[in-house]
From Swiss-Prot:
InterPro entries: RNA_methyltr_RlmE, RNA_MeTrfase_FtsJ_dom, rRNA-MeTfrase_E, SAM-dependent_MTases_sf. This is Ribosomal RNA large subunit methyltransferase E. Its EC number is 2.1.1.166. The lineage of its organism: Bacteria, Pseudomonadati, Pseudomonadota, Alphaproteobacteria, Hyphomicrobiales. The active site is at residue 199. Belongs to the class I-like SAM-binding methyltransferase superfamily. RNA methyltransferase RlmE family. Specifically methylates the uridine in position 2552 of 23S rRNA at the 2'-O position of the ribose in the fully assembled 50S ribosomal subunit. It comes from Parvibaculum lavamentivorans (strain DS-1 / DSM 13023 / NCIMB 13966). Keywords: Cytoplasm, Methyltransferase, rRNA processing, S-adenosyl-L-methionine, Transferase.
Length: 254
């Protein structure tokens, strides 16, 4: 985690541009495993890691959100955003800039944006955002968020990932379960017409989540931004046009 606290660029476009850098090779140290060496080498050679440092983002993941929003335009000036599992804060930085949460031009409804980040981990403040050290599963968390927003949210974001085990199917099931829980929370706090964006892993059950979300959102799709590593099973589910709360909660829908 950095202490820069910068909002960073507003779009992430061209963030990896410039002259091509020489690749760094890392020797395996005596107390460093081969997998750790590969991870370190990948980080040192990752253009998005360098771009994040250059533009003041706390993580390379900021470019994933920026790229998705560049195409689908759901982070609008004046918007109210909830970021679940927000540490270290890269997505909050992007959201703050795009919804004008630090000031600037107000949105279409004459209001400035609002960004609420939730994480059970302690983290440095993000200028322009309200950070709560809170488990979003705790009782009353949804009501607390709506109170801080002075209404319902326009966007709910989740870049959360469950701790990995190294077993692909287990990791897939864990993150899909986490995504479903986040989706249920989203249906409790979103305003009609709202957007839900969450990380998932390919593994066999991701289409079941699409079917479930289509009952509550007008448009549901999978997206994979260029900032997601090509060899990763990671992708995102983007659900737009929330239909509003029904009598049947999302997790009871079939």
């Amino acid at each position: 985690m950095t202490n820069s606290g910068k909002t960073g660029g507003k779009s992430g476009k061209g963030g990896t541009g410039g002259a091509r850098a020489l690749k760094v090779r890392v020797k395996t140290a005596r107390k460093r495993s081969n997998s750790s060496t590969r991870w370190l080498q990948r980080q040192l050679n990752d253009p998005y890691v360098h771009a994040a440092k250059r533009e003041g983002y706390r993580s390379r993941a900021a470019f994933k959100l920026a790229e998705i929003d560049d195409k689908y335009r759901f982070l609008k000036p004046g918007g109210r955003v909830v970021d679940l599992g927000c540490a270290p804060g890269g997505w909050c930085q992007v959201a703050v800039a795009r919804v004008k949460a630090e000031g600037g031009d107000a949105g279409a409804e004459g209001r400035h944006g609002r960004v609420i980040g939730l994480d059970y981990l302690e983290m440095d403040p993000v200028p322009g955002a309200t950070i709560l050290q809170l488990d979003f599963l705790s009782e009353g968390a949804d009501d607390q968020v709506k109170e801080l927003l002075a209404g319902e949210a326009d966007v709910v974001l989740s870049d959360m990932a469950a701790p990995t085990t190294g077993h692909k199917q287990t990791d897939h099931m864990r993150i899909m379960s986490l995504c479903e829980i986040a989706a249920h929370f989203a249906t409790e706090v979103l305003a009609p017409g709202g957007t839900f964006l969450a990380k998932v892993l390919r593994g066999g059950t991701e289409n079941e989540l699409l079917v479930l979300l289509k009952q509550h959102f007008k448009t549901v799709r999978h997206v994979k931004p260029k900032a997601s590593r090509a060899d990763s099973a990671e992708m995102y589910v983007l659900a737009q046009g929330f239909k509003g709360r029904s009598e049947s909660p999302l997790d009871d829908a079939e």
